[in-house]
């Protein structure tokens, strides 16, 4: 019998900022790009639950979040605080949580910076697994002053849905015999891979819930969606064979930024590019890697045309100087006639490194 635990930290970035800044205690918080008085061009990384009440959510344009904040401030007399992200700090807290979890299972998958799967099958009891979940939540709060939501199920799919149902700061265990009843009333969009177009197509057929989806045969789903149809058929029945990935290999490190204003100013672009260089290299130095052999430049023009240029090196790189020199060789042709003959302004800059050797 498989017993899988899914742990999702609650409003992770915003909760860390609230913990670390006294003036944010109990306030509505948005972590993301600088809103620039409503003219910012980035997005919301995380909004805490107080901010979500007003419709602010992750991925929303920061300018839209700012407009909502101003309306709330005017009508509700409540201030929404905007905070710049500190990803280095968040990564450190994530690692602290990972160290806590290692005491509870030898098989852990770090699905993202704030999301983990643990294999608790060795306990052979959902009752014991729920006790472990409560102990994990207690220890995380004791050591990090942060809350988490936990779902437990016979597979990753069910466990993750269960954790989302009990946010924030809750836990839920779904026994194998209860899986179909648990899933039946949920909307089909809860199934991974069911996006808005797929949902619309199924809704037109009268299929709105996972229970409805079970009425369709495997052959019908495959005829409608090809190979994905087989996965939908399995998920609708609560079947998920995906394994816990103990160590997801880091394939690349990088950063990209959307500029405040489209530009072809060499001064502005080099200033921003240097900042990206430093941040990527600092992340590399904090990693378990010793060298890298490939650099990729990502560049987007004002007309949204995107260019990606990579260079692989026979001799591995490890110094900031080499990284800077080689990266500039990729960028500079786009600042003049060589690779930008139409003199198009640049909207986005990014760098990635890969092909690592470990320390």
Predicted segments — roles?
Residues 1-113, 117, 236:
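Residues that scaffold, gate, or flank divalent-cation-dependent active/transport sites
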Residues 6, 190, 198, 203-346, ...:
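DNA-contacting surface of Y-family translesion DNA polymerases
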Residues 16-18, 42-45, 158-166, 244-247:
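Short acidic, glycine/serine/threonine-rich loops at helix termini
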Residues 111-115, 153-156, 290-294, 344-348:
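Short Gly/Ser/Thr- and Asp/Glu-enriched loop/turn motifs at secondary-structure junctions
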Residues 128-187:
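Long, highly charged, low-complexity intrinsically disordered interaction regions
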Residues 118-137, 206:
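Catalytic palm subdomain of template-directed nucleic-acid polymerases
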């Amino acid at each position: 019998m498989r017993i899988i635990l899914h742990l999702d930290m609650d409003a992770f970035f915003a909760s860390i900022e609230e913990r670390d800044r006294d003036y944010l205690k109990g306030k509505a918080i948005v972590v993301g790009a600088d809103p620039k008085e409503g003219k910012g061009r980035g997005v919301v990384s995380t909004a805490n639950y107080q901010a979500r009440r007003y419709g602010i959510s992750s991925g929303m344009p920061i300018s839209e979040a700012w407009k909502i904040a101003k309306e709330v401030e005017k009508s509700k007399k409540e201030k929404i605080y905007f905070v710049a992200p500190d990803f280095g700090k968040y990564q450190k807290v994530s690692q602290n949580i990972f160290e806590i979890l290692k005491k509870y299972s030898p098989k852990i998958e770090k699905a993202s910076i704030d999301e983990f799967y643990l294999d608790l099958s060795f306990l052979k009891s959902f009752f014991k697994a729920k006790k472990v979940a409560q102990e994990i939540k207690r220890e995380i709060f004791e050591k990090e002053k942060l809350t988490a939501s936990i779902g437990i199920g016979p597979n990753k799919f069910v466990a993750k849905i269960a954790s989302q149902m009990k946010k924030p700061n809750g836990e839920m265990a779904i026994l194998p015999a209860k899986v179909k009843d648990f899933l039946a009333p949920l909307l089909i969009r809860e199934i991974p891979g069911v996006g808005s177009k797929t949902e619309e197509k199924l809704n037109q057929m009268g299929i709105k819930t996972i229970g409805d989806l079970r009425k369709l045969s495997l052959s019908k789903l495959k005829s409608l969606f090809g190979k994905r149809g087989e996965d939908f058929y399995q998920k609708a029945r609560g079947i998920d064979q995906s394994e816990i990935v103990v160590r997801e290999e880091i394939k690349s490190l990088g950063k990209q930024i959307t500029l405040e204003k489209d530009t072809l100013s060499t001064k502005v672009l080099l200033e921003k590019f240097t900042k990206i260089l430093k941040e990527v290299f600092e992340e590399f130095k904090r990693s378990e890697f010793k060298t890298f052999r490939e650099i990729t430049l990502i560049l987007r023009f004002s007309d949204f045309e995107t260019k990606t240029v990579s260079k692989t090196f026979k001799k591995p790189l490890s110094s900031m100087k080499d990284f800077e020199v080689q990266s500039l060789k990729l960028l500079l042709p786009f600042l003049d006639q060589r690779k930008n003959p139409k003199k198009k302004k640049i909207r986005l800059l990014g760098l990635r490194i890969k092909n690592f050797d470990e320390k």
